[in-house]
Amino acid sequence: MYQFLEQTVAGHMTRTVKTVTRGLTMRDLGDMFERDDFNAYPVEDDRQIVGLVTKFDLLKCFAFTPNQMVPRYDDLMRRTVADVMTPEFIYVRSDTKLTRVLQLMVEHRFRSVPVIDSGHRLEGMIAREDILRALKACIGRSAG
């Protein structure tokens, strides 16, 4: 188990990550969420990550108070990622300890966290499943 304390994101993150652009429509974003089993996509502009868009952001488009006029579905689906993305988001670096990532995931209920380099370019994503695999491997080594 002590081995887990020394593990960093670099050895466990997914390096090939799908990204979206600010101009992507909600319709296309919805199709991507349906097709891919992801909860979030990094938003990329000129090779830099400028935000994060989640399934929750997409769902928020459909939340209305009783006093609001309900917009037409087609109008909602023409909105873009730029309209709903989170421009200030939590990310980690590849040298971040997995224990810190686990802490962030539990505290904020994240399923995944972007891994960004010093130039704000995407290096990968670290997901709950990656953390669980690392834990399982460390526990297996210490038991064996």
Map each language-model feature to its residues:
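A glycine-centered beta-loop-beta connector
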Residues: 33-36, 41-57, 105, 113-130
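Tandem CBS (Bateman) regulatory domains
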Residues: 1-16, 54-90, 97, 102-106, ...
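The conserved cystathionine-beta-synthase
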Residues: 20-37, 43-44, 91-109, 116, ...
